UniProtKB/Swiss-Prot annotation:
It comes from Shigella sonnei (strain Ss046). Its EC number is 7.1.1.-. Pfam families: Proton_antipo_M (PF00361). The chain crosses the membrane at residues 8-28, 35-55, 71-91, 105-125, 127-147, 159-179, 203-223, 235-255, 271-291, 297-317, 326-346, 373-393, 408-430, 455-475. NDH-1 is composed of 13 different subunits. Subunits NuoA, H, J, K, L, M, N constitute the membrane sector of the complex. One of its GO terms (cellular component) is plasma membrane. GO terms for molecular function: NADH dehydrogenase (ubiquinone) activity; NADH:ubiquinone reductase (non-electrogenic) activity; quinone binding. It is found in: Cell inner membrane. Coiled coil: none annotated. This is NADH-quinone oxidoreductase subunit N. Belongs to the complex I subunit 2 family. It is a multi-pass membrane protein. Keywords: Cell inner membrane, Cell membrane, Membrane, NAD, Quinone, Translocase, Transmembrane, Transmembrane helix, Transport, Ubiquinone. NDH-1 shuttles electrons from NADH, via FMN and iron-sulfur (Fe-S) centers, to quinones in the respiratory chain. The immediate electron acceptor for the enzyme in this species is believed to be ubiquinone. Couples the redox reaction to proton translocation (for every two electrons transferred, four hydrogen ions are translocated across the cytoplasmic membrane), and thus conserves the redox energy in a proton gradient.
Length: 485
């Protein structure tokens, strides 16, 4: 096929991030300069974000059989770029205290962002697999970046081995789907999967294996066992990327697959997904109740959040409100997670060995860093789904689509999960205002609010509050992003 100027405009975010990868790589080869390479990475990601405006002007189109650029792709590309940008800004002060090679960190984040953008645009099982591998491979290095710490190295090895196993399940599942349907394109799959075909054993086995592979990447029960250990062992800025960009990109492509290939029409697949959603919500919240490590706590809570999103995915056949629910919920989850992990990153910067991830490190934070404590409180309230925060709007949407689709037992799970989630989120928030220990173990820099990471954290808190009270701008953006079927 011929690549036209319109196609190149549609691929601008991908091309800009790819070019930034090359520029940063050459810059590292020429001369190691931490500030220069961090700045180049941030400029490249910002340029990719700005280019989305030009992509919108070009309109929806299929760019090669592997990719479709439309409003849906633009929304998820934007969310991935925001998460990558935040990761780079949190990493800069953290790396200032790191004595080994700093610059490769940005290179790995940029390559992972490239994978996320590819996933947001994927319209074919081949591009889905390529995107997942492109986002996973750099994460093996990022998770073990603090390799002199046993916990970080252990997390990296665990994530690498389990991720490779999950990828093999995903690939084998795709092979079985191809054997039955004769095509790997999402649109062709939708056309080829007739009424009777969804009950074919080979096809069900293929989709089942794909659910195992994708369930691992999304930390869904029972494929979640790596999540708390990897979140705890990875450096705080890397945990930010894992919790946000990685999950958002993969969930976005899964939703597009469900939109085009009506897998939800199969009763067997719906039942399996409903059981996974129920188990993720209940187990994620129950395990988070006993955690005293903030990164582990947020790891378990991310399992429950993906369970809530799965409820909206199961209800996808009932209408466009489910797509709206997923978009709003993911935006709320992104800003809340960026704020929470951002505070952990600021408290852990510059690098001084293990991160400040113990709940005790945050005890009495309000008395010497009041604004930082207020930001953390807002994030905990949003993740808990308290009214007047963006997290509440997202959770309300999920409940609404669950009721609309008559998924009563899953609605019950969302209510019970949210109620139990209140306990551990409020426990973190309350500890910020307790009597401070005489000698605090870790603390954020005194001028944290003037750093790039501090500004990102403050903007995230502001967006969570403003969009929680007035969500219409976000809802309008999500509605514009409905894929043009």
């Amino acid at each position: 096929m011929t690549i036209t100027p319109q196609n190149l405009i549609a691929l601008l975010p991908l091309l800009i991030v790819g070019l930034t990868v090359v520029v940063v790589m050459l810059s590292i080869a020429w001369r190691r300069n931490h500030f220069l390479n961090a700045t180049l990475s941030v400029i490249g990601l910002n340029a990719a974000l700005v280019s989305l405006w030009f992509v919108g002007q070009a309109g929806a189109m299929d760019v090669t059989p592997l990719m479709r650029v439309d409003g849906f792709a633009m929304l998820y590309t934007g969310l991935v770029l925001l998460a990558s940008l935040a990761t780079c800004t949190f990493a800069y002060p953290w790396l200032e205290g790191y004595n080994d090679n700093k610059d490769e960190f940005y290179l790995l984040v940029l390559i992972a962002a490239l994978g996320g953008i590819l996933l947001a645009n994927a319209n074919h099982l081949a591009s889905l697999f390529l995107g997942i591998e492109l986002i996973s491979l750099p994460l093996f290095g990022l998770v073990g970046y603090a390799f002199r710490q046993k916990r970080s190295l252990e997390a990296s090895i665990k994530y690498t081995i389990l991720s490779a196993a999950a990828s093999s399940f995903l690939l084998f599942g795709m092979a079985l789907v191809y054997a039955q349907s004769g095509d790997l394109s999402f649109v062709a799959l939708g056309k080829n999967l007739g009424d009777g075909m969804l009950n074919e054993p080979l096809l069900l086995a293929g989709f089942g294996l794909m659910i195992v592979g994708l369930g691992f990447k999304l930390s869904l029960v029972p494929f979640h066992l790596w999540t708390p250990d990897v979140y705890q062992g990875a450096p705080a800025p890397v945990s930010t990327f894992l919790a946000t960009a990685s999950k958002i990109a993969i969930f976005g492509v899964v939703m597009r697959l469900f939109l085009y290939a009506p897998m939800g029409d199969s009763e067997a697949i719906r039942v399996v997904l409903a059981i996974i959603a129920f188990a993720s919500i209940i187990f994620g919240n129950l395990m988070a109740l006993s955690q005293t490590n903030i990164k582990r706590l947020l790891g378990y809570s991310s399992i429950s959040h993906l369970g809530y999103l799965l409820v909206a995915l199961i209800a996808l056949q009932t209408g466009e409100m489910s797509m709206e629910a997923v978009g709003v919920y993911l935006a709320g989850y992104l800003f809340s997670s960026l704020g929470a992990f951002g505070v952990v990153s600021l408290m852990s910067s510059p690098y001084r060995g293990p991160d400040a991830d113990s709940l005790y490190s945050y005890r009495g934070l309000f008395w010497h860093r009041p604004i930082l404590a207020a930001v953390m409180t807002v994030m905990m309230l949003s993740l808990a789904g308290i009214p007047m925060t963006l997290g509440f709007i997202g959770k309300f949407y999920v409940l609404a689509v669950g009721v609309q689709a008559h998924l009563w037992w899953l609605v019950g799970a969302v209510v019970v999960g949210s109620a139990s989630g209140l306990y551990y989120y409020l426990r973190v928030a309350v500890s910020l205002y307790l009597h401070a220990p005489e000698q605090p173990g870790r603390d954020a820099p005194s001028n944290w609010q003037y750093s790039a990471g501090g500004i990102v954290v403050l903007i995230s808190a502001l967006l969570v509050l403003v969009l929680g009270v007035w969500p219409q701008p976000l809802i309008s953006i999500v509605r514009l992003a409905m894929p043009l079927m």
